[in-house]
Amino acid sequence: DGAQRAALPKRGDLVVAEASASQDLGPVLALPRSRTTGRRWGPRQMQGAAHRPDPSGRGMLNLDDGPASKDVLIVEHRLGFVMANAGVDQSNAADPHGPPLALMLPKDPDASAARMRDELHRRLGCRVGVVINDSFGRPWRIGTVGVAIGCAGLPAVLDLRGDPDLFGRSLQTSILGYADEIAAAASLLMGQADEARPVILVRGLKKDAPHQSAQALLRPAGEDLFT
């Protein structure tokens, strides 16, 4: 409704929405304290809530050893994302003085992005791309960054192999995580705390490449050097 009043977005724009703004959120998870580890959620809850049931070689890694890794589980989510605590997050989920709750990732972020794109077209008559983003930590790096967990109406990756560099040499391995780059840039404006900016409009980016879902950003297990 706000977009209609402001006559935004326009054809060719991109809309980046944080996971909590999508209409396909996973269930809210109650967090009884684990009797064995003291964390508010344990491996059984993680597996039941989000862990991919079919083995792919990555599985679940419990990082309980040492203070730096307290209360962390590295999990392959059922959507294919390898992430801390399966993306279960208490930030902005509920009043801290109320019962402990956490939000899970959307059930199907790509479908959420497609529905948002279609609804914007229905209401405004313009075709836009949509990225659903969430904050991820990164191995060997401090700090979280925005990552695309769903997208529709834009390329998720841009294959630059074969394109010339400044000196005419053909690029050999360069594949750009296009949707991730957009998600990270938008995350700077969204913020991580009480900024309350769940949707960001991106203008001026246009790439003539096949549209893909965010699944195109996932490296196949057979190409994973860490598996």
Where do the protein language model's features map onto the residues?
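N-terminal and secondary-structure boundary signal
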Residues: D1-T227
